[in-house]
Amino acid sequence: MESDATTSEPKASVGSDSSPAEQTVLATLRDSVAAPTRGFMSPVRSVVASPRPVKGKAARRRLQLPPVTQAETCDEEPVPAVPEDQEEAQPLPPIYASPMRGMWRSEKVALYCDQVLQGSKAEDAEEAMSRYLLEKLKAKDRWLGVWKSNPELFFEKYEEASIPFVGILVEVTCKPRQNLSSCFKVTVSVAEPFSSNIANIPRDLVDEVLGELEYSAPLLEVYPVDGQDADVRDIALALEVVRFFYDFLWRDWDDEENCENYTALIEERINLWCDIQDGTIPGPIAQRFKKTLEKYKNKRVELIEYQSNIKEDPSAAEAVECWKKYYEIVMLCGLLKMWEDLRLRVHGPFFPRILRRRKGKRDFGKTITHIVAKVMTTDMVKNLSSDTLLQQHNDLNLALDSCYSGDIVVIFPGEYQASNLALLTDDITIKGVGKREEIMITSEPSHDSFVVSKADNVKLMQLSLIQQGTVDGIVVVESGHLTLENCLLKCEGTGVCVLTGASLTITNSEITGAQGAGVELYPGSIAILEGNEIHHCNNLRTSDSSKSTLGGVNMKVLPAPKLKMTNNHIYNNNGYGVSILQPSEQFFIVAEAALNKGAASGDKKDDKMLSKVMQTLNVEMNNNRIEANLKGDIRIVTG
């Protein structure tokens, strides 16, 4: 593995009989593929590179005997049995628990930026990490650890899920080296009592593997055993610091790009990791980011291994395959950079979600009422006029796909899913028949968005919208106007987002469970809220106080949004009832009396809470009950 990881040049040369086109491809290949593989020349990074993907689907350990019948059904040779007198390995002792998850983000930033990197550039990061680790290793040259080795060293075939690593209790000997990078290799020997996470692994096999490796193992694969002295505990922490850096903070393209302030970039990635951990970034998109990052790492390893198997005079097919692998890496790299730049924020819609054109009205000018129900009866349409054009669907998605501007979609009780709710471009009305709790529309977890509108006038009436897994707001108004009337919104991500220039009317509805604010108004948006309940929002698990202020309604200003609130009940939110996000205090003016005019007693619970508001802020509040919110009722928040 390590020899593969240190390949420095792609093996692609041109034979004398190659065509000009092939020569061009291969020459381009040398220049372009060399760049993404330079990162693998580092002994540090090769140690912590992602393990090679398992080849094949067979799953049977070489030296653990399965039932003979199983081997026969698989048409494979029976494997030799482990001798009955073979001594079973003892269970592994506990290792030091990683302190990284327990650190506050400010502590992580101080550790990496101030203590370890100390202003280093990206190309000097490896040396800085090596120097930091070597300093800790000087305190103790012998200690016990668990070597978590690659199962491929011991097994021909195995289940990666059931055997993520082969753990062996070893005694570690650290010898000072002249080269900083070489300190990432240490001498190991089997410690007594013989211990492993695989009870029946033969000791002679372990000795054989260690002999082949010259009793040397990557230091970052060794985890110090708990219960040793303070020096070993410091070594364990240092190892976790280095592992965390290369697993989560380092990118292979870092030393290939000019970054004026590398520590600032590391701080951004620490914030990104913390936002994923504390739920600021919803789980589905965080999972997608992690999978893309892992795929990127694996593709780089695949490229290096493919290059190492190419002969001195590669064929055109090999060159093209090498180029394809490189192209995949470039695409994944670009995607990761884009996601990192956008910070994956649940608060900020950075791009249009709808790229579909409006249909407009039908050619013959008529509108259709779409009935969504498994079976349609005459009773369902008795209240409709005799000239109403009807179309029945048993699928809400098909009904929405059939709509033109002016159509009405009538939904009868049941449970529905419809990805087309995220593509509302025409002026339609979607309404339920019966109690809103009986018309349940759930989002599809595989989609980013649930309900997104950019039509001039869309109405949703008497519906329950239940968000499951989508990462966007439960309802996003990109442009135009959207009305929610007598609806129940059970959020899992953010609540209702009204983007710049869009407008929203919510009446007699209930919004609950949002990770951020229940209603989020972007600069220049308009919202009218009447007779609603907004509660139990801002369920972010975060230590960042700036994010914990969001609650019922959040307004982002410059230019100021317009908000009219009447007869709303905003309660039991983890942030403020109403928060107004300002960029800086230089725009504040004193207008406490204006904002409190006409407010109910709940709005004035603390007269000192609101002392300044935006000069151009257009807020009208009448007879609202804002109470029992964790942070308070109304607050200006400086961004």
Swiss-Prot record:
The modification N6-acetyllysine is found at residues 556, 631. This is Testicular spindle-associated protein SHCBP1L. GO terms for cellular component: cytoplasm; meiotic spindle. PbH1 repeats lie at residues 479-500, 501-523, 524-557, 560-582. The modification O-acetylserine is found at residue 3. Residues 285-312 form a coiled coil. Disruption phenotype: Male mice exhibit decreased fertility and produce reduced epididymal sperm content, but do not influence the rates of motility, capacitation and acrosome reaction of sperm. Meiosis-arrested spermatocytes are increased in the early stages of meiosis and undergo programmed cell death. Display a diminution of the HSPA2 signal at the spindle and disordered chromosomes during male meiosis. It comes from Mus musculus (Mouse). It is found in: Cytoplasm, Cytoskeleton, Spindle.
